[in-house]
């Protein structure tokens, strides 16, 4: 058995250059041995668990959808909103919600306290992320690359 105490885990903080987006994560699965860059399913683990903290007046990440990844959230403390294709939905401690692949989403802390959530994702191999507001993609091969492209015919450049 592998065991960690999440109260003792360090946090990795992510902040955008102008500060609109910010969150901190405790990478629980990685502390339990998950190797996110591996293609070995035993090293990758079947799911990824993190404790995410979003400061007041911040969004966790730009509005995005995953091509193949499921994400489950459970609000531990605080309150805020979730932006998805249906609009804005209020969330508070005790709420749980899930996003299936292809469904754009974003966590917004419009409150005055930290918004803390459990995040469980299945992190499948070969997934990509689409950002509808900026019309760009993030792909991994194996490092993450951000791209934007005009639509092309499937056979463009092939014949």
Identify the meaning behind each predicted range.
Residues 61, 87-89, 129:
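Short beta-strand segments
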Residues 86-102:
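Short acidic-glycine-tyrosine-enriched beta hairpin
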